[in-house]
């Protein structure tokens, strides 16, 4: 089976400042991958390269054995969907109108997918609300529904796609964080490749198949949660002492102990 996505020595720099350096990566169809690391580690820049939002200044990123730079914007939008870290809407669109922006097929065909997206993020009661009146978490869920609709409409034409999420749980309460993680897990089981930036190491360890750990622009670790969530590695990358235990499923979880002086 061909890889869903590959990066070969992919780097990105602005002038003489390297933001991401020589990342090599192979992502299989249906994998759920979490990208973790401290602020400024290069996580969002890496995700933007993997999505095609920016081109590597060196190396290459390929999706389905084809360089991302060769896709037209329309074809790229049909094959991958991206939830940005910040999406500000300054106009009084309704929740329905925002979500429908993700559809690229006939509305009659997309209607069941639209209804499913609204249900998945628990926004049935908010369909007609002005999005500018919603809380930050409600707005984030609205945009997640839009991205899901885009993904599913694209998959109707192209088959299993790619879902990229930049800090998708940043404004969500614990219930909706778990809802989103479960939804990402279901997408992966259906064949979608999911890559998400997460700051919650425990959420990453519980739901991800693999964890990529970024540090100072480099891919420092790539492996299973048990292989990456280790006290020595966490201390080196995050500069904090952490105790690693196991939950009832065997997944590692961390407890802050004492920051290094």
Curated annotation (Swiss-Prot):
What keywords does the record list, in alphabetical order?
Answer: ATP-binding, Cell inner membrane, Cell membrane, Membrane, Nucleotide-binding, Translocase, Transport
One GO cellular component term, please give it: plasma membrane
Matching entries from SUPFAM superfamilies are given as: P-loop containing nucleoside triphosphate hydrolases
Q: Which domain of life is it from?
A: Bacteria
The UniProt annotation places ATP binding at: 37-44
Query: What do we know about how this protein assembles, alone or with others?
Result: The complex is composed of two ATP-binding proteins (HmuV), two transmembrane proteins (HmuU) and a solute-binding protein (HmuT).
Q: What NCBIfam families does the database record attribute to this sequence?
A: PRK13548.1 (NF010068)
* Family indicated by similarity: Belongs to the ABC transporter superfamily. Heme (hemin) importer (TC 3.A.1.14.5) family.
* Protein name in UniProt: Hemin import ATP-binding protein HmuV
């Amino acid at each position: 089976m061909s890889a869903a996505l590959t990066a070969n020595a992919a780097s990105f720099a602005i002038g003489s400042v390297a933001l991401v350096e020589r990342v090599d990566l192979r992502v299989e169809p249906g994998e759920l991958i979490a990208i973790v690391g401290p602020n400024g580690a290069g996580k969002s820049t890496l995700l933007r390269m993997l999505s095609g939002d920016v081109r590597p200044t060196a190396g290459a990123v390929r999706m389905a054995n084809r360089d991302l730079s060769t896709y037209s914007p329309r074809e790229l939008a049909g094959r991958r969907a991206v939830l940005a870290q910040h999406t500000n809407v300054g106009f009084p669109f309704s929740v329905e109108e925002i979500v429908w922006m993700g559809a690229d097929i006939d509305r009659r065909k997309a209607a069941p997918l639209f209804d499913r997206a609204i249900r998945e993020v628990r926004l049935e009661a908010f369909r007609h609300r002005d999005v500018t009146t919603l809380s930050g978490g409600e707005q984030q869920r609205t945009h997640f529904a839009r991205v899901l609709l885009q993904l599913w409409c694209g998959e109707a034409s192209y088959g299993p796609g790619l879902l990229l999420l930049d800090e998708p749980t940043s404004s969500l309460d614990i219930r909706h964080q778990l809802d989103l993680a479960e939804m990402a897990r279901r997408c992966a089981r259906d064949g979608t490749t999911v890559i998400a930036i997460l700051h919650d190491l425990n959420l990453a360890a519980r739901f991800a198949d693999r964890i990529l750990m970024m540090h100072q622009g480099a891919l420092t670790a790539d492996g299973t949660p048990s292989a990456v969530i280790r006290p020595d590695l966490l201390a080196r990358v995050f500069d904090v002492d952490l105790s690693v235990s196991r939950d009832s499923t065997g997944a590692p979880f961390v407890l802050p102990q004492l920051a290094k002086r």
